[in-house]
């Protein structure tokens, strides 16, 4: 992401406990170090002030009101003459309250806790780097198993190696004796480890370079083996090779990013800034709190209980300590990702708690909703419908959307034309929808392009510029040929409208992003604006016409199909004007169609300009009709020629339909527009 500090990216990864401590700890001017959250409380029920060392402590996270401490004293922020910079009574610094949006705290865990993302998510990074089954590691983390091994290469008392289950018969009665024996803590810390601490010790002992070398050698050995013929064994070898590749890549990633594997086990738990997990007071004095606050409270309660048990470990049974460590691990798991281990935790109203993972992931998460796809001003959204009468570079904006997007421009136009004295009067005219408002809106829209975007924007054509026009209704009208570039369908898809404000954005929209300038695919160069199937069917219906021909007899196959119950006995068929009307131009023909005097496929005679191809044709006429004044008509299959007494051509009529005429006019207008554009460019 790009911000005011020119950061070009945001990377999420593991951090060291020292880094977490550096994020949260701060030294007050009196030398006191604060940052650790030790109490599970939020606000005092009587004073409504944050509890000291609690989840909303002002000493840790900063003052609620800028320059005002918890005691109510005020200091001017940034004034060097004001001294001291903090309240000596409550220890709150006199700083801006916005610090509560980024100042973090931390919880010092009484026992190590594995990060559930690295343990339970697939693939499990902890299981991959340790080369152990996930089920075995889960049993160790949640204290179902213990891990016995020499620590720091010292001599051992027990002849145990690896994992062992506490409930096996050989240790069922002997180990409890050690749990209550004086000095058991020293023995346990020396030879027996359980919980996330055992995982942390194993991760800390790893040599990543040796892992890469050994994995590569094993991968080569497996690659040299020939197929055994046993499908199960061959698949097993293939899976092992894939696992070794993933393990080497993970180890290389740790080396490349200077991340230690033991950082996947937490010793310090970061606490989010208070403004990111707020408590809001609603009507009636009731408080609404973020679910994360309740999950943090649960972690602090269980962690404090474990701390008390460890401080009195001489009188505390070891089983109770292990059980409490498991509860702390489960509380942290719920905070980070509720429900990842099965049944999610719910509140008193049977509502699932929203954990940290739920806050950041998904369509409504922090990244997609507020960082990647946050809503912006001068934008709208609506369903798209087809607008076949629109030019390729235009789109239809509903009046309701257009007046909101261009409201500031309309207000400026009303004030400039002295139709409104101030902004308030202009807004009242817009609310009343006076006719002058729509006139000014149309003037504004003529010189201002808009950007249409359909998510997901996977390539350059996912956002294009259009010249807007006002349309009725509440849907955005779009030319059907631009559908493919957006990968959209007219079956309920929605598109966003944006108004480019700066001159640079408007110039880019006009010169690079207009839809009629993006006719080719940027990936492969093929045409992107091609007729769809419904357009092809429409063109076929438009130009199919009546194919019976000028001659009608019982041997004509088209006549026999369409008129099976009719018989034509007039073999000497003659041309008759009443059946096929004459028109002097295409406008008259289309007008007759709109008046429903003829059909779309009805044959008609249209007067045509003199065509040398027709004049020079040697085709023999089918019939010749003579008029009383000496003129005569030479009738051919698809045209007729009217000649004078001196055999001079007076005019030519072609036999066509209204559908052919409409298509011809569209092609002619397109060619003329292209010629005008070329002449303008030269």
Swiss-Prot record:
Family, per entry: Belongs to the RNA polymerase beta' chain family. RpoC1 subfamily.
Self-association state and partner proteins as the record states: In plastids the minimal PEP RNA polymerase catalytic core is composed of four subunits: alpha, beta, beta', and beta''. When a (nuclear-encoded) sigma factor is associated with the core the holoenzyme is formed, which can initiate transcription.
Transmembrane regions: none
Name of this protein: DNA-directed RNA polymerase subunit beta'
The protein's required cofactors: Mg(2+); Zn(2+)
Protein source organism: Eucalyptus globulus subsp. globulus (Tasmanian blue gum)
Residues holding Mg(2+): 489, 491, 493
Location(s), subcellular: Plastid, Chloroplast
GO biological process: DNA-templated transcription
